[in-house]
UniProtKB/Swiss-Prot annotation:
Major subcellular site: cytoplasm
Family annotation (InterPro entries): FAD-bd, FAD/NAD-bd_sf, Ubi_Hdrlase_CS, UbiH, UbiH/COQ6, UbiH/COQ6_monooxygenase
Cofactor dependency: FAD
Pfam families referenced in this protein's UniProt entry, alphabetically: FAD_binding_3
Effect of inactivating the gene: Cells lacking this gene are photosensitive and are not able to grow with a nonfermentable source of carbon. They also fail to produce ubiquinone, and accumulate 2-octaprenylphenol and 2-octaprenyl-6-methoxyphenol.
EC number: 1.14.13.-
Statement: the UniProt record of this protein carries the keyword Heme: no
Pathway membership: Cofactor biosynthesis; ubiquinone biosynthesis
Cellular component, GO, one term: ubiquinone biosynthesis complex
Gene field: ubiH
Protein name: 2-octaprenyl-6-methoxyphenol hydroxylase
Enzyme kind, highest EC tier: oxidoreductase
Length: 392
């Protein structure tokens, strides 16, 4: 019997490819996705850019995926972290860790095209796209999924990779814990008068964190957080006003901000499932947890989930175990628990730490940034998580 994956965004598509590679096509996978990846309306493969940590790129290379993404990626050679209006900062450089890059920035629409090209020829993978789940039945020994096309699939384990507030997981009785941050993330691609040269920036401002990631064609991908109550004001700004405000918040490290492209915005919250497994069902990626974009940890955490689950399922199959058995799924959950809790905790703490303008706390966090800049062991702690070198 097979693995049935619902959701063909980054997490679901990568999981299908990982299982195919690790099992050499011996473990059948059905991947169900409602929207063709070529569509600009695809919610998982839109115009956004994401940063893949070096550790994530290494894992993608291991399963033969990175080789197809490398030509559309932009290397991050330096990360500069600072607190606006204060002296504290820390810089991470790839050369300090004998690396060519700390990570890579990719545009999701480009990634979607390449992942689905790989999926169409991956041994053991059957694509059901575009198609949707009409009904799910879970029995003691298997799962049965009926598609809107009328086809019925039978498998040992069901994977929810259908994003935040997963409809599949909800239908399977999973509860959610959510903490709204009362913040809005504004996303745009911007142009600057000074070349980024692979530099990425994380800047904490009075309104919220601001990240600039290097992209192709000299552009930068911007994620700029604002209090939720400023939504109407920020979204009403003209291009010129937006660039002026961004210049004031970001500074002149990349010279003049000359252009801002189409802007989109969404509210931010920490959302995570109370449990990542239930009867013959596993949650991965944003279906398991959706984090604040601060420090770019969410997607890389999801990729560690994906790789660990692929290994757990293929190992169970090799041993002749029922891979949907609760004991097998518990092994996966226990394996991921420490990293998941730590990453959620660190990300959530950073949001609250840098949102607080209480003077003693501001002084303390700037001392912390300066300490990391001056003392290599302290800086290495930040680097390990930035690089995605985290035990799975």
């Amino acid at each position: 019997m097979s693995v049935i994956i619902v959701g063909g965004g980054m997490a679901g598509a990568t999981l299908a490819l990982a299982i195919s590679r690790l099992s050499h096509g011996a473990l059948p996978v059905h991947l169900i996705e409602a929207t063709a990846p070529e569509s600009h309306a695809h919610p998982g493969f839109d115009g956004r850019a994401i940063a893949l940590a070096a550790g994530t790129c290494q894992q993608l290379a291991r399963i033969g995926v990175w080789q197809s993404l490398a030509d559309c990626a932009t290397a991050i050679t330096t990360v500069h972290v600072s607190d606006r209006g204060h002296a504290g900062f820390v810089t991470l450089a790839a050369e300090d860790y004998q690396l060519a890059a700390l990570g890579q920035v990719v545009e999701l629409h480009n990634v979607g095209q390449r992942l689905f090209a790989l999926l169409r020829k991956a041994p053991g993978v059957t694509l059901h796209c575009p198609d949707r789940v009409a009904n799910v039945a879970r029995t003691q020994s298997h799962v049965e999924v009926t598609l809107e096309s009328g086809e019925t699939l039978t498998g040992r384990v069901l994977v929810a990779a259908d994003g935040t507030h997963s409809a599949l997981a909800t239908a399977c009785g999973v509860d959610w814990q959510q903490e709204p941050y009362e913040q809005l993330a504004v996303i745009a691609n911007v142009a600057t008068s000074v070349a980024h040269e692979g530099r990425a920036f994380e800047r904490f401002t009075q309104h919220g964190p601001l990240a600039m990631l290097p992209m192709s064609d000299g552009r930068c991908s911007l994620v700029w957080c604002h209090p939720l109550e400023r939504r109407e004001e920020v979204l009403s700004w003209s291009d010129e006003k937006f660039c002026r405000e961004l210049q004031s918040a970001f500074g002149w490290r990349l010279g003049k901000i000359t252009h801002a492209g189409k802007r989109s915005a969404y509210p931010l919250a920490l959302t995570h499932a109370a449990r990542s497994i239930t009867h013959r069902t596993v949650l991965v990626g944003n279906a398991a947890q959706t984090l604040h974009p601060i420090a770019g940890q969410g997607f890389n955490l999801g990729m560690r989930d994906v790789m660990s689950l692929a290994e757990t399922l293929t190992q169970a199959q090799e041993r002749g175990e029922d891979m949907g058995d609760y004991g097998v799924l518990c092994r996966y959950q226990q394996r991921r628990q420490s990293d998941r809790e730590a990453t959620i905790g660190v990300t959530d703490s950073l949001v609250h730490l840098f949102a607080n303008r209480w003077a003693p706390l501001v002084v303390g966090r700037n001392i912390g940034l300066m300490t990391m800049e001056l003392f290599t062991p302290a800086r290495d702690v930040l680097a390990q998580r930035t690089l995605g070198w985290v035990a799975r």
